[in-house]
Structures are given as C-alpha cells and as structure tokens.
Design a protein with these regions (language model features):
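Alpha-helical transmembrane segments of multi-pass inner-membrane proteins
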Residues: 1-2, 17-29, 47-65, 78-237
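Short, hydrophobic transmembrane alpha-helix segments
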Residues: 2-14, 31-38, 165-166
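Membrane-interfacial interhelical loops
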Residues: 6-7, 63-73
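Interfacial loop-to-helix junctions that mark the boundaries of transmembrane helices
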Residues: 7-16, 38-44, 73-76, 141
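Extended hydrophobic/aromatic-rich secondary-structure runs
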Residues: 33-48, 64
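Short gly/ser-rich anion-binding loops that grip negatively charged ligand groups
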Residues: 43, 69, 82
C-alpha cells in the first residue's frame, strides 16, 4: 500500500508479525490443552534454538543493541524479526506432523508463488509497471533480488514434488509451473540467484544419482546432462 513508509517492506512485515502473534495465542492455548501441539525435540529444532540463543547474545553485545533488536523500516529484520520467524518455526513444527499436512502447506506456498509469477509475467509483457524501473522484474516484492530468492526456494520445491509423484497430470502441472517460474527468475537478472540455482541443481543431481534408483535417478542424470549441455550449446553458438 502507498500509505505506508517503505510500502514493500513494512506492509508485509507488519501483516506477518501480527498474524504470527495471533497464531501464537491460539497455539499456546492448544499446546496447554492438547499434548500433540507441544514442540518436540529434534536435531533441526535444537540447531535453530542454539542459533537463536547465539543471535540473542550477539544482539545484546552489539554496538547498537537497540538497532540490532528493532532494525529499521528499510529492512524490518533485527532480532525482533528473528523471534517472529522462530515462533513461526515452532508453530509449524508443532502443528504439522504428517507428510500430507506438510504437502498441503507447501502446495499452498506454491499456489502463492504462481500468482506472484503471473504478476511478473504481466510486468514482462508491459501490462504492469516494474517498481524499480528498468527491466528487472520485481513483482509484488519491489526488489528483483528478493523475488529471485523467493522463486529459488519454490523451484526446488517443484523439483521435489515432480520427482516424488507418479501421476502424469501432476508432473505436467509441476513442470509447467517450473518453466513459468524459471522464466521469471531469468528476467529478474539476479546473477547470484541464477548461479546459485545452477549450482544447487548440480549438487541435487549428484546426490540423487548417488542415493536414488530407478526413475528418479534417470531424471537426475538427464538434469545433470542438461546443466552441462545447455550452457555449452550457448557458448558454441
């Protein structure tokens, strides 16, 4: 919204933090009433908790503890932002238990990424303005680098679901969304994200070739071949 200071940052952050705080009230109540909603120890949970403790100490001992905790309107990060993300992590980990529940969560996130990608597509077609000016797509983020990072996560989520499903129509849908988001990633012109995506593909392909068998392994080999041959073809042409 244009009425906010740094509208692409503050609006999303205030909305996220308010929603997390409301969810936290419901979650704490549910955790007291029903044991299944209480956090369970895991390697990831312990690692994240240690990280939060270290960041808390770093905040207190920083040059400006006030700014380290509250950050600024330009970024809206700081330790207060980490605390909300940590709370979100605890709520998700305590609420979603089964693979089906996690699948629904990630599919909801993918649906949102499709809407964001179509926004970028309309920018590419000249139907919507690019907020930064120039030609780098930024969609609803107002920043091409943020959009690229967002798409980076969802591209790998799409790869995961593509490899795990055996239904042709699902694979076709995942593949179509993957191509859409890959095009938008390219037109963000964010070199770091694009190189990171290529490096991630190589690493994922190597791991799948080593650890998987059957169809997944064949897809991994095909992907590795494409990563090598496509840049080579551009170079030769």
């Amino acid at each position: 919204t244009r009425s906010l200071y740094f509208p692409f940052i503050t609006g999303k952050n205030f909305t996220f933090r308010i929603l997390i705080e409301l969810l936290a009230i419901v979650w704490v109540y549910a955790a007291f009433r029903f044991p299944r909603f209480r956090p369970r120890a895991s390697a990831i949970a312990v690692a994240v908790t240690i990280f939060m403790a270290v960041m808390g100490i770093a905040t207190v001992l920083s040059i400006s503890p006030y700014k380290s905790f509250w950050s600024s309107f330009e970024r809206m990060e700081g330790y207060i932002g980490l605390l909300h993300l940590f709370l979100y992590f605890l709520i998700l980990g305590s609420t979603f238990r089964s693979p089906r529940e996690w699948s629904q969560f990630f599919h909801a996130s993918l649906a949102a990424s499709v809407l964001v990608s179509f926004y970028g597509l309309f920018q590419l077609a000249g139907k919507l303005a690019i907020h930064q000016g120039g030609t780098r797509l930024d969609a609803t983020f107002g920043n091409a680098t943020y959009l690229a990072t967002y798409l980076l996560f969802h591209l790998f989520i799409l790869i995961w679901f593509f490899l795990r499903t055996h239904q042709p129509w699902r694979r076709a849908a995942y593949g179509a969304v993957f191509l859409l988001e890959l095009v938008i990633l390219y037109y963000t012109a964010t070199r770091g994200a694009i190189l990171g995506f290529i490096g991630g593909l190589v690493m994922l392909g190597v791991l799948l070739v080593i650890l998987e068998r059957g169809t997944v392994r064949r897809w991994a080999l095909a992907g590795l071949g494409a990563v090598v041959l496509v840049p080579l073809a551009f170079f030769l042409v």
